[in-house]
């Protein structure tokens, strides 16, 4: 996302203080009538698009991403101050927007923003500075828009178990911030396509480099809006290359996140799909907002949305894997609110009206039976279960050893088990019409006492536990719950080598 700075001197503005005490509402419970959202970036600088005070942003927007929080000399500590108005006025503006159902999110990075987290000290500085800024101004969440410094190191080959310190520490830091604020905290991401969909053709350098971040934070992620611009073209699930700024491109790139894909073409290494409501498309508000291309006319984009959400074809080359579409797809993001205002509000007016008139297609059939049910014994006490998405499903039930658990996440972690015990699993899909039949059952056995477990993240290890990491055995010397970045090789206070 491009920006050119021109410093603006603070101006004196007045806002009634009562707004500071109005309640904050849910992120999707604003003044607009649809559950679809419009997310826009707001410039904390002047690049010739005009100055808009935060409180004067159009009510057509549901989420306002403030661009940008940026790092200071250590490249880890984040700073932010409003270039327009005073600190107090900015706080009051956020409080006012919250009072009318909007969310205001601090975006970090941008085209020129660099955040580097090579070690624990840098990670701590990042976490502390972010929490300080969020508390100071009352931000409702954070947006990760890092376009520099996110590159995989040479031996980092598994997106599920990353080794790149920058990525490992970023995941751990963002998770800590989200945990600090709880489930209503907004977490969004705005990577370029090379960092996400690019992982379909290669996993090295910046290609696919966001996949471990998305995977490591998918349980915290509110939504992701990949930038479908300044990209040229990308390869889709059908193996064809599509050009930015076309309906085919918008649909194809979005479905990669909705269906999942083999990383670097490896069918044994699948990036599993995100939930429909976690997927948003990022677009430029006008041609000038994306100098390297990607603008699409609203009339053409609406064809793409009709196909993506309703399954109504427009005669394009790309064919949806799920021909019925994805009605819970969440919405659109744009760079930027300021560019939209400069272009006579074409973006916000066109898409707000479209989304407000969107009606979920009626559900008339039960969902299909889930297929691809598989399980893996992670340890002596944990089995992970996953399955393919079922057509028409809005949720899933899991039958574990004959007991039904409703509305489970995919993948599902079955924990607190005993070693060498076998467990049975079946899954069914659910929607408003009813339930599918149960899938075929699978049997999975936990690891035995004699097995040396591979180290994993988010597992409770007790003093004396033995794990294997990169072919070396380690003994736990301090009870803890593991996190990405706390691998035995990195934490001598928690682990010691053993035979």
Q: Which stretches of residues belong to each language-model region?
A:
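Substrate-binding cleft of secreted/luminal carbohydrate-active enzymes
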Residues: 44, 267-361
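Short beta-strand segments within Ig-like beta-sandwich modules, predominantly Fibronectin type-III
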Residues: 403-409
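Pro/Thr/Ser/Gly-rich low-complexity, intrinsically disordered linker/stalk tracts
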Residues: 362-391, 419, 434-448
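Short beta-strand elements bearing conserved aromatic residues within extracellular beta-rich modules
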Residues: 396-398, 474
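Chitinase-like catalytic core of GlcNAc-active glycosidases
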Residues: 30-252, 256, 276-280, 285-299, ...
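Sec-dependent signal peptide cleavage junction
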Residues: 20-31
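Tryptophan-rich substrate-binding surfaces of secreted polymer-degrading and adhesive proteins
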Residues: 422, 442-499
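Beta-strand-rich modules
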Residues: 414-433
